[in-house]
A protein has these predicted regions:
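N-terminal domain-onset segments
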Residues: 27-82, 91-92, 107-243
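Short, solvent-exposed aromatic-acidic interface loops
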Residues: 99-107
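Low-acidity, Ser/Thr- and Arg-rich intrinsically disordered low-complexity segments
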Residues: 5-30
Length: 243
């Protein structure tokens, strides 16, 4: 993966505020605590990300690399360096994007069982805690946690770098183009044709072995590429995370 330090996620103008009531035992009055969530500068919808993850899984399966099979309500992605990301669907119209960068996430420990770490949920809706639970289930650190409300992504307003960068994780077409190029290079394949890669990204979970073969070309037939395995891996994503 690229080694450049990620930018702190930019937050466009606008924020939402969730209000919690805290009652002091020494006073009859209640204090009102405001904790804002800020919009995340990410245009990709949950469906867009699910489609990109299907392509990533197809390429990895075709070249013989491990990938996470989709589960109902959750798509998990990780690489050997310790980076991971998950797309979760807690309910209709809702989604969570959770993950961790092994070098750049400074919100360390919030997903590990037994460690409090940085609070990434705060007073956001309770279903955001599904992201923390997912990290703990995988015994993984949690660096970032974003919630989708049906129209855009939101994050808790906290100062520490969470390690998320859309150029490093498979959440944009540009990022996945780079990932496909790197996977082809790492497995000694020819440099992928850019137009063929674009067609593959557009196809998403409906990609075919022929479309995959146009991207993963082996000189002289070596190393071998299992295009059918790649197409099967992509098809598994068609109904794994329903909208």
């Amino acid at each position: 993966m690229p080694g450049a330090r990620p930018r702190t996620p930019a937050s466009p103008a606008g924020s939402r505020t969730f209000t919690g009531i805290a009652t002091s035992s020494s006073s009859i009055r209640s204090s009102v605590d405001h904790m804002a969530v800020l919009p995340v500068d990410l245009d990709s919808t949950p469906d867009d990300i699910a489609s990109l993850l299907a392509v990533d899984a197809a390429v990895r399966a075709a070249v013989g690399l491990d990938h996470h099979a989709p589960a109902t309500g959750a798509l998990h992605w990780s690489v050997d360096e310790g980076m991971w990301m998950a797309l979760l669907r807690p309910g209709p119209g809702r989604a969570l994007l959770a993950g961790w960068h092994h070098e750049f996430s400074l919100t360390e420990g919030s997903g590990n069982a037994g460690e409090a770490g940085t609070d990434l949920v705060g007073d956001a809706p309770g279903w955001w805690r599904r992201g923390v639970e997912h990290a703990r289930t995988h015994d993984a650190c949690l660096g970032f946690l974003y919630g989708w409300d049906g129209s855009r992504w939101w994050r808790l307003d906290q100062p520490a770098d969470d390690g998320f960068d859309p150029e490093l994780f498979p959440v944009t077409r540009a990022a996945l183009r780079d990932i496909v190029d790197e996977l082809a290079d790492d497995t000694l394949l020819d440099a992928p044709d850019p137009d063929a890669v674009e067609a593959l990204l557009t196809a998403g979970s409906a990609l075919t072995a022929v479309e995959l073969g146009a991207v993963l070309h082996a000189p002289d037939g070596w190393p071998e590429v299992d295009l059918d395995a790649g197409a099967r891996a992509a098809r598994e994503f068609r109904s794994a995370v329903p909208a």
